[in-house]
């Protein structure tokens, strides 16, 4: 399985995705496709075509490619999820692409590789957040988290409630809630390396690292501008 962490307009994903499409290896994008960092000097003119291409890849290979959503994607659908670097000049295009192709995206994914269960989200899942928002989510066992988040996303009647609780931001990200959501949770909130969801190893991005990924006992934060692979034994390797 190939893992593509936060893109933000970068091109590092293209070669590993192209190779994986040829070999049939599964691919998962962890979200945050747009809103590049100004200091990286990424031309914004190519971002809409890039997002269109990624969506096209998903349409062409629906069973092979998984597209997760991050906070920089969702804030084009709900202003309460607003974050930095919102691109007002291209917002109308992003809104259309995310809204009109919403069924191609999801909030979470899971897989079992090498005897290990993996849960993929944009920013990680805290047990405390699941309990904090159980009025909306219901009482969830670890094995129900992925399906419940995706159910709420794909059901247009439940989606507004999901977007409301996804706007939860903890103090680690200058928010006011006791827990961050799976698109806003900060790596500091996971820093104790607690086993938040027993039996699941969590993989996420969102918290950009200067150089190397953070790979712990119970989670891996891979937001470091490179692609990764989970091999058949369940080990994470940089590509």
Question: Where do the protein language model's features map onto the residues?
Answer:
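Beta-strand-turn-beta hairpins that frame and shape the catalytic cleft
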Residues: 1-2, 110-119, 216-217
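Core catalytic region of metal-dependent phosphoesterases/phosphodiesterases
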Residues: 4, 9-100
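Active-site neighborhood of phospho(di)ester-bond hydrolases with catalytic His/Asp-centered motifs
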Residues: 4-5, 27-31, 66-71, 120-121, ...
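Active-site environment of divalent metal-dependent phosphoester hydrolases
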Residues: 9-13, 35-37, 72-78, 126-128, ...
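Short coil/turn segments at beta-strand junctions that form active-site/ligand-binding loops
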Residues: 23-25, 63-64, 105, 115-117, ...
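Catalytic core of PPM/PP2C metal-dependent serine/threonine phosphatase domains
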Residues: 98-114
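Active-site-proximal loop/helix segment associated with metal-binding centers of metalloenzymes
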Residues: 112-194
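Conserved beta-sheet core of the metallophosphoesterase superfamily
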Residues: 183-239
